[in-house]
Amino acid sequence: MKRYMICSLLFLTTFVFAQNKMNTRKGKIVFEASIPSFEEIRATNENVSCVLLTKTGEISSVALIKNFRFKLSLMEEHFNTNYMESNDYPKATFKGYIQGFNLNIIGSSTKKFELNGELEIRGKTKPIHTDAFLRKIEDCLEIIAEFKINTDDFDIVIPEIINSKISKNVTVYTEFLVK
């Protein structure tokens, strides 16, 4: 009987704590550094991890650099080898907070929140302040955000020979469906 009580207590404790966290391993990040009239510079990573702590609004995500896909494999190779040095810097991370987050006030209509945190790429960390748009979809929570970063902030060097074809100001779009 004592063993049954202890097992039940452990199960309930785990269940309660699990309710405070929502996550996914199938989040999406799309970035674009295109310049009009030149080749599209756009990549997508659809295997991004994201964790949201529902009690605090704390959010974090991790993207493996080598999981970004371009329309041309040569772009992917240059991105990983020359610009991001993905063997030395294999991931990008974001850690932050959704200000005023309250799961109870989010419904099927999109609700805007302020998202603040730090983005780390290539060992360099920069603050990010943007809007996040949240809504419930069945038993999941959709989190969408968009922001801009500058390649210089993360020591990403674009060779002079092609710097007129790649924008230093990169638009980053994120989409997570956490459960």
Regions inferred by a protein language model and the residue ranges of each:
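Bacterial Sec-dependent N-terminal signal peptides
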Residues: 1-22
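Low-complexity, acidic/polar, glycine-enriched regions of mature
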Residues: 19-179
